[in-house]
């Protein structure tokens, strides 16, 4: 479902007519070699497209107009090969709507000590050309990613590739829809939010459909489609054979087919359900939701559209990378002194992309929702570095809270726990990380990912100009409290 190859990134090189046609030709040739080399590196998720060298204000404005109008263009990379006076860039930058990366590099890695002359100096001016360009970005208060270093360096390429994945997630969020089946869980605060502001700031279009419409589609699913899907279940998962379980699994298969059809029809990228509004659905969607998350859809339980959108964004960022991303909830604690851990799970809806083993389909009673026993995938989660991220509405802004965690082995079996689960240690440690999370107002619902790291989320927040707070091994609680106070002032004063 997620194809980052559909996007492209425009590579804009700045110069001016001052240096003459011969120098401009060399600028174009060297830029072409850089872009060709980058496109030959599989680390980049999308194609980088070189545009003609930009030499005056009219050309610059025109290229940004075209970038804005091109849905395939997910972002713009700028580099000043020579000195390119930045007043020329104001009209173009002022209309830019795409994520922006400022690459501060140079074609040659080393100074040619024995042959360097003024022709070389006039050609290779990014050392001061990019400083001029950096000033106009700062003066215009533009959100941008700055990457510094030689274009052949692995670290430089990794940072560009991460940013490209983030930009793809932003473009995806601006063109798709989040479908809500029913409303938020009654009386819950953190899952609420301003859907109008979400579309303005994040690009997410969030709309609600009645569960009854979905229920009618479930009833109309052809039996032959159900049989085909059951064959796939048997191939991919450990599946029970008893009649009680198979009946429940068939109902989830029907819901999966109906949900997928509905989501495709609405051009949806994510969706929510709530156990308080199931209408004529036979079960709370469990296996069906897990399967759709596995395809790449974002999901949020209990109407949590912010979690659904964030899960989708991380899935786009991590598409094709090792690991996975899931809707998650901090469920219960293991509080042995010195080894405090969090058990993350949800009633049914944990994505199998984070499974460390072949998932099992199980059917068990569910005490809420008032429906038949639902089928779900059960598994232990992957081990290793991960992130937990939550987006909350603070009234005058969105706040992204991110915690680096270490997922650890589940050393004891839990034979009576009928849900997928993952066990992690928050960094820097349980007490400080949890204190900071609670002080920041982070939700109990999160996007949990073993595919992306904190840098992706920082790039995402900065590109969208929303507040972010990072809780990691460098946390100082007193400074964190100060950051919360400073942010209140900053975001209160900021008017854009």
UniProtKB/Swiss-Prot annotation:
Free-text cofactor note: Binds 1 Mn(2+) ion per subunit.
InterPro entries documented for this protein: Ara_Isoase_C, AraA_central, AraA_N, AraA_N_sf, Fuc/Ara_isomerase_C, Fucose_isomerase_N/cen_sf, Lara_isomerase
GO BP of this protein: L-arabinose catabolic process to xylulose 5-phosphate
First-tier enzyme category under EC: isomerase
Catalytic activity: beta-L-arabinopyranose = L-ribulose
Gene Ontology, cellular component aspect: cytosol
Keywords: Arabinose catabolism, Carbohydrate metabolism, Isomerase, Manganese, Metal-binding
Pathway note: Carbohydrate degradation; L-arabinose degradation via L-ribulose; D-xylulose 5-phosphate from L-arabinose (bacterial route): step 1/3
Record: residues binding Mn(2+): 302, 329, 346, 445
Cofactors that this protein relies on: Mn(2+)
Gene3D superfamilies according to UniProt: 3.40.50.10940
GO molecular function: L-arabinose isomerase activity; manganese ion binding
Coiled coil, from the record: none
This enzyme's EC code(s): 5.3.1.4
Record-stated family: Belongs to the arabinose isomerase family.
Function: Catalyzes the conversion of L-arabinose to L-ribulose.
Protein name: L-arabinose isomerase
